[in-house]
Amino acid sequence: MSELPTVSIYTDGACSGNPGPGGWGAILRFGDKEKELKGGEPHTTNNRMELMAAISALEALKKSCQVELYTDSQYVRQGITGWIHGWKRNGWKTADKKPVKNAELWQRLDAALKPHKVNWHWVKGHAGHAENERADQLARDGVAMARLQKNVRG
């Protein structure tokens, strides 16, 4: 069996108000190739945008990869490496029997992981990590796009 290609992914989410207009950004790096992704929604939360950054990056991969995914969101990292196992066992309910917030995004992230081997890394946000800073800028661009979308819709 051949070795999987290694891709580094850097993600971030942002929200102006929580809830409010939000954006997400991701950088995918494979060797010397790099791709930037961004998007936004007019009414969302920071946690949803953090999830969308990871989902969108993983869904953009065209074949199975070894992924090193860097996020400044403890919510995403802890959720996908720990909490999700209990949620799935409990029918997408928390330990106190409440519905999991953002369950549809967690399910989408779980599905996006399936073809890949992913190592999750937490990086401190706004601490000078170049790729995290760039992902943050892409996320803020996504917020601006979402604001425009909101204003156009009225």
Swiss-Prot record:
Its cofactor is Mg(2+). It is an enzyme of class 3 (hydrolase). It catalyses: Endonucleolytic cleavage to 5'-phosphomonoester. Disulfide bonds: none annotated. Its EC number is 3.1.26.4. It is found in: Cytoplasm. One of its GO terms (cellular component) is cytoplasm. GO terms for biological process: DNA replication, removal of RNA primer. Binds 1 Mg(2+) ion per subunit. May bind a second metal ion at a regulatory site, or after substrate binding. Keywords: Cytoplasm, Endonuclease, Hydrolase, Magnesium, Metal-binding, Nuclease. The keyword Metal-binding applies. GO terms for molecular function: magnesium ion binding; nucleic acid binding; RNA-DNA hybrid ribonuclease activity. The keyword Cell membrane does not apply. Mg(2+) 1 binds at residues 12, 50, 72. Residues 3-144 form the RNase H type-1 domain. CDD domains: RNase_HI_prokaryote_like. Mg(2+) 2 binds at residues 12, 136. Endonuclease that specifically degrades the RNA of RNA-DNA hybrids. Belongs to the RNase H family. Monomer. This is Ribonuclease H. The gene is rnhA.
